[in-house]
Amino acid sequence: MPKKLKAAVENLNDEQLDTPYRPEGWTVRQTVHHIADSHLNSFVRFKLALTEDMPTIRPYFEDRWAELEDSDLPIEHSLRIIEGLHARWAYLLNEMTDEDFQKKLNHPESGEWTLNKMLGLYAWHSRHHTAHITKLRERNNW
């Protein structure tokens, strides 16, 4: 995933990075930072579920996070976070047992989730947001 995201944003200038992928949507820059924020949260949630008995996780307001000042930073900061995080996450996933993937956490708004289901969600999440960026590039002939 980190390589596909990096390819999707390669050679975009600041004006392009600050373009929303849809009307009233996040900019490319905000989207990249959101992926880093979201996947950091998910990695911590995985570790909580692996080390605690059905922990209740803390939701966060992702839209508000996307409006914070650090969302204006260069995307390279988040790309490095994503690359390092995914290296660690992939290692952890490879070491997990079938039993580990069935461990659960509780989300206060959406209920029980197994780690296997969460893994599917975040794999989709990566593809979904990367596609937002690649489709914007196609529409604008970037």
What is the role of each PLM region?
Residues 18-63, 90, 104-142:
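Short, contiguous alpha-helical
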Residues 1-2, 6-8, 45, 66-102, ...:
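Acidic/histidine-rich alpha-helical segments that form the ligand environment
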Residues 2-22:
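A glycine-rich, hydrophobic loop/mini-helix early in the fold
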Residues 8, 12-15, 53, 96-99, ...:
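A short secondary-structure junction motif
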